């Protein structure tokens, strides 16, 4: 997902910031329905639908971790509300990597980088 998919452009509220006037669910729902419906198990879909990041087991011993770097996009004014760790994604990433390390598994991280 790119930063221009949200509306207004660059606007990506976290789950905690969404309410009656702010929504990003339409985008996350569309991505899951159109692209990943058959590729993610229910738990992974639920994680993505909450804040746009997820992890999934690709094969035994290999986990894919997908980050939502849109939270860190400079134009995302929701950063003013939580600029240290939007949606606690970094905390979650640390937990995922620790879990993989403890199991002796590999983890591959994907995300979109902005230039």
Give residue spans per PLM region.
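Extended active-site neighborhood of metal-dependent phosphoesterases/phosphodiesterases
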Residues: 1-95
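Active-site-proximal segments of metal-dependent phosphoesterases and phosphodiesterases across multiple
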Residues: 74-84, 98-115
């Amino acid at each position: 997902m790119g930063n221009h998919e949200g509306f207004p452009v660059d606007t990506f509220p976290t789950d905690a910031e969404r309410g009656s006037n702010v929504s990003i669910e339409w985008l996350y729902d569309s991505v899951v329905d159109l692209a990943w419906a058959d590729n993610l198990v229910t738990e992974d879909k639920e994680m993505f639908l909450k804040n746009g990041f997820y992890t999934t087991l690709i094969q035994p011993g290999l986990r894919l971790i997908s980050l939502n770097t849109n939270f860190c996009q400079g134009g995302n004014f929701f950063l003013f509300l939580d600029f240290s760790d939007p949606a606690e994604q970094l905390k979650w990433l640390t937990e995922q990597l620790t879990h993989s390390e403890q199991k002796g598994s590999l983890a591959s991280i994907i995300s979109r980088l902005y230039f």
